[in-house]
UniProtKB/Swiss-Prot annotation:
InterPro entries cross-referenced by the UniProt entry: AAA+_ATPase, ABC2_TM, ABC_transporter-like_ATP-bd, ABC_transporter-like_CS, ABCA, P-loop_NTPase, R2_ABCA1-4-like
Membrane topology, from the record: Multi-pass membrane protein
Gene name, Swiss-Prot/TrEMBL: Abca3
Native organism: Rattus norvegicus (Rat)
A cellular component annotation (GO) from this entry: lamellar body
Protein name in the entry: Phospholipid-transporting ATPase ABCA3
Length: 1704
């Protein structure tokens, strides 16, 4: 029941996601229909010709050899060979045969057949042998007679001589080779008569090659040998002639030939995109950790697969139903693509193929954890599994049944074989029917359609088993691997016996063993929800082991929130991942609600709620759908779901976002939703990994309240980087450092252990005197310590024992506040932040902020002294201009940034190295780029050579028994006695051979026509020969009629007649058994045959196109991923020129393209393909390939703009390449076949398709090959030249000729299109289009803007904001050039269903050395402002100027003057931190000699040195932010934009970042910063504005805003109430009494937060009162500060409506 419910839920999820991905779904439907459409279109275009009357053929005389043989061969006469030469009888018969013919001929005996074969192979005169008669008897003596039962075989030349070019449209038709003795019928049957225009039956040439004449002559000679006189008498009154069966009225349909060859390929291409989509969808879920997240929520793996399978199956069912409809529906009078086949069987076949394709895609997906890589390799494998068909098709008749079945283990081959069978049944005229399911097409074959269906289903099962096994043993990055033999373990099938936690483990206090003073006693009265015992995790990094967690032992209790703290990389996320079963612990145990994590994960997951660090949301599900989905997944009933979801939406405050898709939510809302998912359906164990990162202050508070409410009966584990959050929420706080647990206890316990006393924090004014402050503090409190000096903050530690001196100190500070330049100050007891920093410092001195700051500055001082010999007044910590400023100062003096050509070259080099690094790091991709084309071509050439490695034909007995039981009609219209006699003998003879003689009383030919039209295709297998005995004057004419649909019926028919005559002469025991055993090929012929490959040029081109389709689309991957993560935007902002960016990429990609191209030449050389390797044609081929590269790469760049995910781009562009190359190439090639009669249309299409590089390449390669071979043939001999002229076979002397088959137009087209695509690319990217875009957008949006601005509330504007506006609106020219950033009435409207005014007329001027803070709630318009300022979004109205240049008109110049750190890290995973900084340093134009020093400084200043040489993808979130900030700061741009730079950083890193930013500011840079951390804004900003609904609501320095919008003090106190409410109430009463007018702002658990209004309150006084009250009211901890910025910020909260879209 549960299973069904989960299955239904997953199906609903998959269906909803599919429904929302409209384009993908449409493409999946459209592509199969497109390929079916191509067939329908061809069906309509290819005219079938109706032949209304029966076709009747004339008699064929076999008494004489054809005329061709009356001309002697070059250099001699024809030879008639016989074996064995020592037998007189053999010689006699052969001589008799020679005398029978009128031409000059000599007899040549060979002692054994081997001698004869050697003669044929190696003797140059062997081509003169007309035929050899080989008797299959052992003649011991020369005089031994010939027995009555004669057995012999005729050996004619392998290559036919009397062969005329027939106009089949393909010069070198494979079928012209050999005698087809391996098969009885053609591989592909034809619906009309075979070779309708040849009365002699055409191939393999029994009549025209003289085979029947020789056969009849030998048979007559045998009769004369045994009964000379009576034979002589018989043949005087009897003549034997042959005749072809008449053919009933039929429709001549060249389309059936096209379909037999192309149906498999088109079906395979139809499912390519579906296959790639499946692989991508499944792996993307794995890559985004969604699959593992669902597993953590209690979903079993097999259900996950079943749901995917059912969804894709249902979808495929729709697709194949449409395809069946298109194939079987009659498009014009009684003609469909498959006119005769049973639609239900066609549907069954396509469905079986779809099922096996789905299973195949599943199997491929298990080997990958990255969607890009999976789609790349998966697509290649999909094609790769089709290639064996190229080997199978030509060898089909030689293969045994088991070989055919084995090759069907690849589903694509099985499908191709099935499609081929459908084509054969269609051509046979019956179509495939259910009754034919177990019957082969004809007697030749032993393979039937039922076996194909069976194999497709078997493949699906096998692929499914591989999927199951691989997923269990290699679950990828996330998941617990099973041992390789897991399926043999009973525990796998029956489950583990439940491990009961041992009594000693239950009772034992885990922390006793190593209890130190830093671990607080455990609560006695609470149950432990999670017990962790000695848990360790070791990671393999390269060859080294890296300790992730070392021996962690910890209890987490129900009803409590346990907070886990640690700097980035301390092991918090690792611990959570082990507890949730994402990866297994290396050693140790953990029990969650009594279940062990490595054994009972299934049980544990039922009660687990998880909110991971990264959002694991489905982009296309709405908020409510997420909650529904996960609630039901955890087991909530459908009935209770709506209420629970409604409740949760209310709790989260997301009611208005109920129906928004998650991809449109802002970062903060996504976090809320993730927490909601963790909480929903009453999860008992919650694990929240940084749940509030990226939220604004209001949202964060809401989440705190939510967690406090929800914790009562749950065990909650939470990690965070916000110390106030830890302090407020944590009942117990555990701190990890370097993978080890350092301490654990309540926040109070930790503060007592680690606290050093009180902290006094001062915010400096620009003219501040830090020295003076320091002296003053030390005067009052001698043992005070300077704690940190970061940004605008100074903080001192005042020891507890000096409390009595504080009042006088504070009084003095208040008095001298102006004089010392103090903006504001506050004091607090030990904070959690301090505890955290102290713990870090004890474990690792590199975490000590002062220790870090000093050496960094010292180092810079030394560098400056040595490198630039500049003196500086560096006075340690107190000097404000250092750090990154170290480089800044020099640059003003010495360092001149590169400009002009030098800058362009430097940028080009930087971009080129970026591409090179990508290839180097993504070596698998490069390997695929090289191997795919080489493999494809090698396989194609192997298949072609394998085909052309023509086997010598086997012997074939010319007897009806080969065909099974057949009907032999005969008629005796004459009255002669001989005729009657013969007919009776015939009846007896046939019955003895188990054949069915049938006497026809009327006209025999009419009977045959009637039977053929009644029986249809089956007639050709049941009736192969017929005979008539009629009188012609004195003579009786015996006619051997043969059904020409079978290859060997002429000789078989004659053999029956000759046998009949022999029996008549010599009695029933007489018989002649004849076989056709063609001669082996001579070495000369073998060499010649190598070239006569039918579709070799076509095959080479086709495989090359398949390879190129995959190769070309890889060039889009980096382009898309750079754009998606905004790295490209940041590079442009850093000053890269468009041409530099794209041309460097093009150059590298052309070099990457050259490597496989050269290897392709090597392959052609290895296979010695003359067309491409002789006469200097290798250079031509290389030119073709490189021109293709030059055309296709820019096209891929252009098309990459349509995609936002690299994997999507890769799959869709591969499909585009297949369509634009293979599909167009096949269509044009089919239309060029003369029989199809569409040459004119093919020429038109060929010209239309010239814009597609893929088409040009395919046609050029194919034409080049064909032209070479035709030219070589036509100039090989006079006869050949005569033939070529006679049949108008054209070739070009100049390969580059314009007209077909020259390749001039393709070459020119590729050369031109490369240039055109590049020009288009530059137009899209450059200012020209940018300006046009700005103009058009602005034009369209201005009226919307005016309308919206009229609507916005007419609130009076704040005075400061108005002053700033007027300052900006009337600027002087000097001030414009001097002011780094001026924003003038900037507005932005987003066109949505309801147009959104995101930014509304903001004006601002940011001066040098100023750090301006943009504050606002999520959705206030901060990020949109940044996007406009950096040129990512167009401006609706207004403008902005950077260094005097306008953003609307001079975006290029503007970008050279700005640094930008976007909200989400715009980093390239494949580079190291150092490489990225070096790249951006080059982009900025820092001279090469200084780059290393500059990068070193930046790394040191941001504490990134230990990580400098690691790949960015291995960085933690905090380190990525540091690197992004470093990139913005490097090269000293005039204006720096930082969008939430410190998100996700731990406190140490955050302070270092502030330091760095402050130094940049002090060196004269203008900085604009947005942040959710008010602390950060106070530390860094000189001025700030609070944005609400796209407008500035207030503006000024932090102190100014605090004084204006909030006066008095802020008091936060934590009371030790121990759950007794009255204790807290007493304290609250005390505050109300002592500070009249005080307002209780906030109350959380035991924490109260008051606003103390006070004009008359002095800080010293407040402090004094609280010190005294501390003991009395049990105040654990309090802090008094001037009103904080956060409170000012929150006072604007009510003005901001609920947010709309991400970051706007």
């Amino acid at each position: 029941m549960v299973v069904l419910r989960q299955l239904r839920l997953l199906l609903w999820k998959n269906y909803t996601l599919k429904k929302r991905k409209v384009l993908v779904t449409v493409l999946e439907l459209f592509l199969p229909l497109l390929f079916s459409g191509i067939l329908i279109w061809l069906r309509l275009k290819i005219q079938s010709e109706n032949v209304p009357n029966a076709t009747v053929y004339p008699d064929q005389h076999i008494q004489e050899l054809p005329l061709f043989f009356s001309f002697p061969p070059p250099g001699g006469s024809w030879e008639l060979a016989y074996v064995p030469s020592h037998s007189d009888a053999a010689r006699t018969i052969t001589e008799a045969v020679r005398r029978e013919f009128m031409i000059k001929m000599r007899v040549h005996g060979f002692s054994s057949e081997k001698d004869f074969e050697d003669y044929v192979r190696y003797d140059n005169h062997s081509s003169n042998v007309l035929a050899a008669v080989v008797f299959e008897h052992t003649f011991n003596h020369s005089k031994d007679p010939l027995p009555l039962a004669v057995r012999y075989h005729l050996r004619f030349s392998y290559t036919r001589r009397n062969y005329m070019w027939t106009q089949t449209g393909n010069l070198f038709l494979k079928e012209t080779e050999g005698w087809h003795t391996a098969s009885l019928f053609p591989l592909f049957p034809s619906p009309g008569p075979r070779e309708p225009s040849s009365p002699d039956g055409g191939e393999p040439g029994y009549i025209r090659e003289g085979f029947l004449a020789v056969q009849h002559a030998v048979d007559k000679a045998i009769m004369h040998y045994h009964a000379n006189a009576s034979a002589h008498q018989l043949f005087q009154k009897l003549t034997v002639i042959t005749k072809r069966f008449p053919f009933p009225p039929y429709i001549s349909d060249p389309f059936l030939i096209a379909i037999q060859y192309q149906l498999p390929l088109l079906l395979m291409l139809s499912f390519t995109y579906t296959s790639l989509t499946i692989i991508r969808a499944v792996v993307q879920e794995k890559e985004k950790k969604l699959k593992e997240y669902m597993r953590m929520m209690g979903l079993s793996s097999w259900l996950h697969w079943s749901a995917w399978f059912l969804m894709f199956l249902l979808f495929s069912l729709i697709v194949v139903s449409f395809m069946t409809l298109l194939f079987c529906v009659k498009v014009k009078k009684d003609i469909a693509v498959l006119s005769n086949s049973d639609p239900s069987l066609v549907l069954a076949f396509l469905l079986c193929f779809a099922i096996s394709s789905i299973s195949f895609s599943f199997m491929v997906s298990t080997f990958f954890s990255k969607a890009n890589m999976a789609a790349t390799v998966g697509g290649f494998l999909y094609f790769f599994t089709y290639t064996p068909y190229f080997f199978v098709a030509p060898r089909y008749n030689w293969m045994t049944l088991s070989q055919k079945l084995l090759s069907c283990l690849l589903s694509n081959v099985a499908m191709a074989m099935g499609a081929q069978l459908i084509g054969k049944f269609e051509a046979k005229g019956t179509g495939i029917q259910w009754c034919d399911l177990l019957n082969p097409v004809n007697v030749d074959d032993d393979f039937c359609f039922g076996q194909v269906l069976g194999m497709l289903l078997l493949d699906s099962v096998l692929y499914g088993l591989v999927t199951w096994y691989v997923e269990a043993v290699f679950p990828g990055q996330f998941g617990v691997p099973q041992p390789w033999y897991f399926f043999l373990m009973p525990s796998y099938w029956c489950g583990n016996p439940r491990t009961v936690v041992g009594k000693e483990e239950e009772g034992g206090d885990p922390e006793k063993a190593f209890r130190t003073e830093y671990f607080e006693a455990e609560p006695e009265d609470l149950a432990a929800g999670i017990k962790i015992k000695h848990l360790s995790k070791v990671f393999q990094v390269g060859n080294k082991d890296k300790m992730g967690i070392r021996d962690l032992t910890l209890n987490l209790y129900e009803g409590q929130i346990t907070v886990l703290l640690g700097h980035n990389g301390a092991g918090k996320t690792t611990t959570m991942s082990m507890l949730t079963g994402l990866f297994p612990p290396t050693s140790g145990h953990a029990y969650i609600r009594g279940y062990e994590i490595s054994q009972d994960m299934v049980q544990i997951r039922k009660s687990l709620g998880l909110c991971p660090q990264h959002d694991v949301l489905f982009d296309n599900l709405t908020v409510a759908e997420h909650l529904y989905f996960y609630a039901q997944l955890k087991g909530l009933s459908v009935q209770k779901c709506p209420e629970e979801v409604k409740q949760m939406l209310h709790t989260l405050g997301l009611e208005d976002k109920r129906d928004s898709r998650s991809k449109f939510l802002s970062g903060g809302m996504k976090r809320k939703l993730a927490i909601g998912i963790a909480l929903i359906a009453g999860s008992k164990v919650l694990m929240l990994d940084e749940p509030t990162s990226g939220m604004d202050a209001v949202s964060r508070r809401a989440i705190w309240d939510l967690l406090q409410q929800q914790k009562s009966d749950r065990t909650v584990l939470l990690t965070t980087h916000f110390m106030d959050e830890a302090d407020l929420l944590g009942d117990r706080i555990a701190i990890l450092a370097k993978g080890e647990l350092q301490c654990c206890g309540s926040s109070l316990f930790l503060k007592q252990k680690y606290g050093a006393g009180y902290h006094m924090t001062l915010v400096k004014e620009p003219h501040c005197n830090p020295e003076g402050i320091s002296q003053l503090v030390h005067h009052h409190v001698p043992n005070a310590m300077l704690e940190s000096h970061a940004g605008a903050e100074l903080s001192f530690i005042l020891p507890k024992e000096s409390t009595h001196r504080f009042e006088s100190l504070f009084a003095k500070l208040e008095k001298k506040q102006k004089e010392l330049g103090i903006a504001s100050f506050g004091a607090s007891v030990t904070t959690m932040e301090e505890v955290f920093l102290r713990v870090g410092k004890l474990v690792d001195t590199s975490m000590d902020i002062q220790a870090i700051q000093l050496p960094a500055l010292q180092y810079q001082h030394e560098r400056r002294a040595s490198d630039w010999a500049l003196d500086s007044n560096l006075c340690g910590v107190m000097d404000p201009t250092n750090g990154i400023g170290a480089l800044i100062e020099e640059e003003e003096v010495l360092v001149k940034l590169n400009t002009g050509l030098a800058l362009h070259c430097q940028q080009f080099w930087a971009m080129f190295l970026k591409k090179a690094a990508y290839s180097w790091r993504e070596w698998r991709m490069v390997a695929a780029q090289i191997l795919v084309p080489v493999t494809c071509l090698t396989l194609a050439l192997l298949a072609i050579n394998y085909t052309s490695e023509i086997f010598d034909d086997p012997p074939l007995k010319l007897s009806l028994n080969e065909y099974g039981t057949t009907v032999v009609p005969f008629s005796v219209p004459g009255t002669s006695r001989l005729g009657q006699q013969l007919s009776e003998h015939l009846r007896d003879m046939l019955q003895a051979e188990r054949q069915e003689p049938r006497e026809v009383l009327g006209d025999l030919e009419e009977f045959l026509v009637f039977r053929a039209s009644v029986e249809g295709g089956g007639f050709n297998e049941r009736c192969l020969v017929a005979t008539s005995f009629k009188d012609s004057g004195e003579r009786t004419v015996v006619t051997a009629l043969f059904n020409n649909q079978a290859y060997h019926s002429p000789a078989t028919a004659l053999a029956i007649v000759d046998n009949l005559l022999f029996k008549l002469l010599c009695g029933p025991r007489a018989s002649i058994e004849i076989s056709n055993y063609p001669q082996p090929r001579s070495t000369l012929q073998v060499a010649k045959d190598q070239f006569n490959e039918g579709r070799k040029g076509f095959d080479i081109a086709l495989n090359l196109l398949i390879a190129m389709a995959f190769l070309a689309s890889t060039f889009s991957i980096l382009a898309v991923s750079e754009r998606a993560v905004q790295a490209k935007h940041v590079q442009f902002v850093s000053g890269v020129h468009v041409a530099t960016f794209w041309l460097s990429a093009l150059l590298w990609d052309l070099i990457s393209f050259l490597v496989p191209s050269l290897l392709l030449l090597v392959v052609f050389r290895a296979f010695d393909v003359h067309a491409f390797t002789r006469d200097g044609h290798m250079a031509d081929l290389l030119l073709l390939l490189m021109l293709y590269g030059w055309a296709i790469i820019p096209l891929m760049y252009l098309l990459s703009f349509f995609f936002s995910a690299a994997s999507t781009a890769y799959t869709r562009l591969t499909i585009f390449n297949i369509l634009s190359g293979i599909a167009t190439f096949i269509v044009v090639t089919i239309m060029r076949i003369p029989a199809v009669k569409l040459e004119e249309l093919s020429r038109t299409l060929d010209h239309v398709f010239l814009v597609l590089p893929n088409h040009c390449l395919g046609m050029a390669v194919s034409n080049f090959y064909e032209n070479y071979e035709t030219r070589r043939y036509c100039t090989s001999s006079e006869v050949a030249t005569h033939y070529c002229k006679k049949y108008n076979i054209q070739y070009q002397e100049n390969f580059y000729a314009w007209s077909t088959p020259g390749i001039g137009k393709f070459v020119t087209s590729m050369a031109a299109s490369g240039g055109i695509y590049l020009t288009l690319l530059f137009l899209i990217e450059t200012n020209l289009l940018w300006r046009l875009r700005t103009f058009v957008c602005a034009f369209r949006r201005r009226w919307t803007l005016a309308e919206l601005q009229n609507r916005t509330s007419v609130l009076p504007e704040d005075q400061d904001v108005a002053d700033e506006r007027s300052r900006v609106l009337v600027p002087s020219l000097d001030s414009m050039l001097d002011t780094p950033l001026i924003i003038n009435e900037l507005s932005k409207v987003y066109d949505q269903r309801a147009p959104l005014l995101a930014v509304d007329r903001i004006s601002l001027a940011v001066q040098k050395g100023e750090c301006f803070g943009l504050l606002g709630f999520n959705g206030a318009g901060k990020t949109t402002t940044f996007k406009m300022l950096t040129g990512e979004e167009t401006i609706t109205s207004g403008d902005a100027f950077v260094g005097g240049y306008s953003i609307s008109s001079d975006i290029g110049k503007v970008r050279q003057r700005m640094g930008y750190c976007p909200q989400f890290d715009a980093l390239l995973d494949h580079m190291t931190g150092r490489e990225m900084l070096v790249m951006y340093a080059r982009l900025r134009g820092i001279p090469e000699r200084l780059i290393d020093a500059c990068v070193e400084n930046t790394l040191r200043g941001l504490l990134l040195e230990p990580h400098a040489n690691k790949l960015v993808k291995t960085y933690s979130g905090g380190n990525k932010r540091k690197l992004s900030t470093g990139i913005a700061l490097i090269g000293e741009p005039a204006v720096i934009f930082l969008d939430e730079p410190s998100t996700g950083m731990d406190p140490v890193a955050r302070r270092l970042l502030w330091d760095t930013v402050a130094r940049a500011r002090e060196s004269g840079k203008a900085i604009v910063i947005t942040s959710h951390s008010m602390e950060e804004c106070e530390a860094l900003c000189t001025r700030l504005a609070i944005m609400v609904q796209g407008q500035f609501k207030c503006l000024g320095s932090p102190q100014h805003l605090k004084s204006k919008f909030g006066s008095g003090y802020s008091l936060q106190a934590k009371v030790r109430s121990e759950g007794k409410q009255e204790v807290l109430e007493e304290f609250k009463a005390f505050v109300d009494l002592t500070f009249p007018g005080s307002v209780l702002e906030d109350e959380h658990q035991d924490m109260v937060h008051y606003h103390l209004p006070g004009c008359d309150l002095s800080w010293a006084k407040v402090f004094g009162i609280l010190e005294k009250a501390k003991e009395k009211y049990g105040v654990d901890d309090y802090s008094v500060s001037q009103i904080s910025l956060e409170q000012v910020f929150l006072s604007f909260a009510h003005l901001q409506p609920p947010t709309t879209e991400d970051g706007r």
